[in-house]
């Protein structure tokens, strides 16, 4: 049984960057397409197919509207990982006879970095841009990295680990002036912050359903039509999705993504106010009660549903065990199985000791003030206890610089 505490259900979900709970309105919209409206949207000879096709196209227009795109520019995929692979590898394969250079950032999602490493093995040159200590890229460094061989720049809008928001409008302007395609993994920002593909000069954008209170297993890739962007498909078959992504479309999941996008479009301002208020309440109350807690990533240029905090003198893994009533993460869900410190935190210059103490707290649409207050109280009480047991904390209080210690190897 799930324990109850003063009408509070435990454990409290605070891992909104890993996934979001499905909005009940999304589930309600999806259900008929599992049961009575089960037609194949590619069946053109009867009403079951027409009904499913209409639902798919309505969802497509909802997704497009949220980023200021044309309906025909939305290609449905299985999620942001596939979309990122399709965008990066698809551009590389189509244009490799003309250009052979791609630029990305050291702090991108693992699937972007891995797609780029795969292309390196095929002879494509990849530049991995560094980021500043606040997590933001330097625009001059980007400008200087672009050559006449550069075909694509790939920069995510909101970092999944530290929540910083990259200056997409400025990046897009540079790319357009230099005649380079601009791809952005917008999975963590879609439906949460305003994104306009035309104002930002974005040519390709990757979208995920389960990051915006929609179902898992569905995503989309925005592919610009004017000026036209061409990509080589990764999956061959029946030629669905304008030939870019073959396979029968999963109508229920697409309807869910569409409804999630529609809700985000109408409620983004309300969600933002709610999340910002809880972010400030969480962070201010933590800082009032315990010392040497650091917010990773820029405080202002960030999506405030993400609080990545380092607690000096406390191991992140032991902290997670101590606060088991909170569902949190010590890294991205894709890489946190590793005990290595986060590559994103290392890329902003955080030392190994502090990187190991980092925990990511996620705040979302369904997080309550009561949950935040409970989380703060629990964290503060456990931090005090863990620090009292920690020889590292004791050494820090005595002014010993842990970086200068030479540890014995056994």
From Swiss-Prot:
Active site, per annotation: 334 (cysteine persulfide intermediate)
Cofactor(s) it depends on: pyridoxal 5'-phosphate
Catalytic activity, reaction form: (sulfur carrier)-H + L-cysteine = (sulfur carrier)-SH + L-alanine
Annotated residues for binding of [2Fe-2S] cluster: 334
Pathway annotation: Cofactor biosynthesis; iron-sulfur cluster biosynthesis
Keyword entries, A-Z: 2Fe-2S, Cytoplasm, Iron, Iron-sulfur, Metal-binding, Pyridoxal phosphate, Transferase
Gene Ontology MF annotations: 2 iron, 2 sulfur cluster binding; cysteine desulfurase activity; metal ion binding; pyridoxal phosphate binding
Entries under HAMAP family matching the protein: Cys_desulf_IscS
Family designation: Belongs to the class-V pyridoxal-phosphate-dependent aminotransferase family. NifS/IscS subfamily.
NCBIfam families from the UniProt entry: IscS, PRK02948.1, PRK14012.1
Identification of the protein by name: Cysteine desulfurase IscS
Organism from which the protein derives: Rickettsia rickettsii (strain Sheila Smith)
Gene: iscS
């Amino acid at each position: 049984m799930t324990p109850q505490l003063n009408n509070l259900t435990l454990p409290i979900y605070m891992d909104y960057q890993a996934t979001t709970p499905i909005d009940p309105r999304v589930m309600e919209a999806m259900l008929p397409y599992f049961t009575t409206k089960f037609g194949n949207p590619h069946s053109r000879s009867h009403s079951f197919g027409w009904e499913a096709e209409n639902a798919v196209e309505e969802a497509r227009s909802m997704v497009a509207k949220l980023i200021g795109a044309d309906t025909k520019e939305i290609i449905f995929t299985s999620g942001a990982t596939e979309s990122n692979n399709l965008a990066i590898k698809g551009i590389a394969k189509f244009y490799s006879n003309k250009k052979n250079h791609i630029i990305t950032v050291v702090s991108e999602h693992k699937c972007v970095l891995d797609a780029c490493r795969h292309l390196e093995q095929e002879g494509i040159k990849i530049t991995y841009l560094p980021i500043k200590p606040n997590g933001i890229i330097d625009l001059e460094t980007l400008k200087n990295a672009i050559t006449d061989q550069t075909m694509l720049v790939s920069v995510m809008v909101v970092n999944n680990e530290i929540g910083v928001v990259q200056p997409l409008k400025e990046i897009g302007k540079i790319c357009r002036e230099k005649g380079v395609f601009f791809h952005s993994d917008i999975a963590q920002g879609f439906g949460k912050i305003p994104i306009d593909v035309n104002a930002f000069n974005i040519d390709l954008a990757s979208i995920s359903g389960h990051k915006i209170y929609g179902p898992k297993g569905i995503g989309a890739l925005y592919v610009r039509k004017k000026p036209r962007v061409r990509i080589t498909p990764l999956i061959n078959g029946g030629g669905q999705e304008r030939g870019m992504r073959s396979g029968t479309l999963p109508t229920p999941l697409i309807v869910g993504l569409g409804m999630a996008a529609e809700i985000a479009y109408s409620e983004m301002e309300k969600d933002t106010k709610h999340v910002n208020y809880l972010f400030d309440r969480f962070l201010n109350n933590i800082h009032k009660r315990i010392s040497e807690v650091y917010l990773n990533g820029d405080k202002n240029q960030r999506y405030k549903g993400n609080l990545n905090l380092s607690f000096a003198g406390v191991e992140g893994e032991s902290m997670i065990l101590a606060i088991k009533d909170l569902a949190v993460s010590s890294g991205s869900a894709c890489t946190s199985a590793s005990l290595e410190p986060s590559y994103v935190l290392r890329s902003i210059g955080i030392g190994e000791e502090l990187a190991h103490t980092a925990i990511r707290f996620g705040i979302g649409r369904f997080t309550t003030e009561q949950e935040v207050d409970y989380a703060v109280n629990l964290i503060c009480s456990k931090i005090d206890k863990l620090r009292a047991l920690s020889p590292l904390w004791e050494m820090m209080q005595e002014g010993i610089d842990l970086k200068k210690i030479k540890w014995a190897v056994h």
